[in-house]
Amino acid sequence: MNMPLMIDLSNKKVVIVGGGKVATRRTTSLLAYTNHIHVVSPTITDTLQKYLETKQITYEKKHFEPQDVENADVVIAATNQSDVNNDVGAALSKNVLFNHAGQADLGNITFPNFLKRDKLTISVSTDGASPKLGQRIIKDLKDTYNEDY
């Protein structure tokens, strides 16, 4: 069972394995909270390439190897290959925060939908049961809590 928790990522090393759409979404979300994001993937999206060019992320063009996640505080497995995502999880020590983008129950953290308005943060999670519902709830909350909050 997951408990909502706010965490300071500013000094945490984040490694994202994968360079596609899901990895891009996770990276985009995390950039507001840390500048220590390292991506490992044979290819990356245009958006990730732009982040690399503007020095917002670091990148290794390669296939995953267990040593890629050594010394990481947060690891996200976001490839389109479940066996690689599973290998990422297997390479981690128990104290690492791990998100398995393909199967949330194989990780120990998830990414809820959230709304941020200055000091107000509202997160919504369906524990993976209905991501569309979570998105709809956040959309409704955006209408209620506009940029003035």
Question: How does the language model describe each region?
Answer:
Residues 5-26, 133:
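Glycine-rich adenosine-cofactor-binding loop
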Residues 8, 116-149:
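Adenosine-phosphate binding glycine-rich loop
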Residues 20-22, 83, 128:
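Residue-level detector of alpha-helix initiation sites
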Residues 33-51:
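NAD(P)-binding Rossmann-fold cofactor-contacting core
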Residues 53-70:
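Glycine-rich, highly charged phosphate/nucleotide-binding loops
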Residues 1-9, 111-112:
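A short, basic/flexible loop-to-alpha-helix module at the beginning of a structural domain
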Residues 74-78, 85-110:
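ADP-ribose/adenylate-binding Rossmann-like module
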Residues 41-46, 63-64, 83:
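Short, polar loop motifs at secondary-structure junctions
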